[in-house]
């Protein structure tokens, strides 16, 4: 049986760890409330932007396919608009997906349960399945956990975006978007997909693979877990009137769509990380309490045994003196 001193040390050590996990749980809970508020405010706006863009894309899809087939740029030959109106924005022209960029959103730190494991494994499956299908796949990694994971596996990392989580705002999303758009605008990439955790609740996060560019005409989200009614599904029934024209609207709408989509994915991922961390720290607190209770019981038993032994020795000595 361990000595009383060693048991006391173990109890003290577990209590110190419990203080840390309790503090981390409180911090994660406070940050999660703010992150949830941001998502609640941003989701309807992002969905409406995608809805309008999808409507324009569906209307102008035949013109885009004709331009792509003829190898003509978005402005057409000699800058002539296609179909009597301004042609599609260059970022909307769909090309065969031979070269794909997967943008993987992970965290910089651990202690958040299976958050990083789930996203990394899903991204790895996507990378390998597309590679086996004959596509050239490259990765853009956000978060040190993703970088370390794919470096160990020799994955083709095109870009590692550091410091994104240090200051998460629209300017950060725009900077990320600029780096992702550079190879797409040069024709080095045919499609860009976001791989991230979508926040459902503090205990539930769903890994999704969502096409960023070119935007899909309908719901472009492929979920890891079956979930009905995804937040990103645009309404096909909506009809819009465009002023002054679709082309002028697209010049402003497409960059806005890219920035908002990236910002939303970043907020979703951050909230998912905080939810996973909150759950993990709550479980750690409960486990620590259970360990402390067991060690306290063991300590009391050992102390009782020691006291009983001393009493027996005293009684035995007293009886010996009487004799």
Swiss-Prot record:
Keywords: ATP synthesis, Cell inner membrane, Cell membrane, CF(1), Hydrogen ion transport, Ion transport, Membrane, Transport. It comes from the Bacteria. InterPro entries: ATP_synth_F1_ATPase_gsu (IPR035968), ATP_synth_F1_gsu (IPR000131). CDD domains: F1-ATPase_gamma. It is a peripheral membrane protein. Coiled coil: none annotated. SUPFAM superfamilies: ATP synthase (F1-ATPase), gamma subunit (SSF52943). It is found in: Cell inner membrane. Its main location: membrane. One of its GO terms (molecular function) is proton-transporting ATP synthase activity, rotational mechanism. Residues 215-237 are annotated as: Disordered. GO terms for biological process: proton motive force-driven plasma membrane ATP synthesis. Belongs to the ATPase gamma chain family. F-type ATPases have 2 components, CF(1) - the catalytic core - and CF(0) - the membrane proton channel. CF(1) has five subunits: alpha(3), beta(3), gamma(1), delta(1), epsilon(1). CF(0) has three main subunits: a, b and c. PANTHER family: ATP SYNTHASE GAMMA CHAIN (PTHR11693), ATP SYNTHASE SUBUNIT GAMMA, MITOCHONDRIAL (PTHR11693:SF22). This is ATP synthase gamma chain. The lineage of its organism: Bacteria, Pseudomonadati, Myxococcota, Polyangia, Polyangiales.
């Amino acid at each position: 049986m361990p000595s009383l001193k060693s048991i006391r040390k173990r109890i003290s050590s577990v209590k110190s760890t419990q203080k840390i996990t309790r503090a981390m749980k409180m911090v994660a809970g406070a940050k999660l409330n703010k992150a949830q508020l941001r998502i609640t405010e941003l989701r309807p706006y992002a969905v409406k932007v995608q809805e309008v863009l999808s409507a324009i894309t569906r209307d102008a899809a035949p013109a885009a396919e004709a331009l792509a087939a003829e190898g003509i740029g978005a402005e057409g030959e000699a800058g002539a608009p296609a179909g009597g109106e301004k042609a599609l924005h260059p970022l909307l022209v769909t090309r065969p997906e031979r070269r794909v960029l997967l943008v993987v959103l992970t965290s910089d730190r651990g202690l958040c349960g299976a958050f990083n494991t789930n996203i990394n494994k899903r991204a790895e499956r996507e990378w390998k399945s597309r590679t086996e299908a004959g596509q050239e796949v490259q990765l853009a990694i956000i978060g040190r956990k993703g970088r370390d994971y794919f470096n160990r596996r020799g994955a083709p990392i095109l870009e590692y975006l550091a410091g994104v989580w240090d200051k998460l705002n629209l300017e950060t999303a725009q900077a990320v978007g600029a780096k992702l758009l550079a190879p797409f605008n040069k024709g080095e990439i045919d499609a860009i997909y976001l791989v991230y955790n979508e926040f459902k609740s503090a205990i539930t996060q769903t890994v999704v693979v969502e096409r960023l560019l070119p935007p899909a005409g309908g719901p472009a989200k492929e979920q890891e877990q079956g979930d009905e009614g995804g937040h990103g599904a645009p309404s096909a029934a909506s009809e819009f009137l465009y002023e002054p024209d679709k082309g002028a609207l697209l010049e402003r709408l497409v960059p806005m769509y890219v920035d908002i989509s990236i910002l939303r994915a970043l907020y979703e991922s951050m909230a998912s990380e905080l939810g996973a961390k909150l759950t993990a720290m709550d479980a750690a607190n409960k486990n620590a309490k259970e360990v402390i209770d067991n060690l306290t019981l063991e300590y009391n038993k050992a102390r009782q045994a020691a006291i009983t032994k001393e009493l027996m020795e005293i009684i035995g000595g007293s009886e010996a003196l009487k004799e």
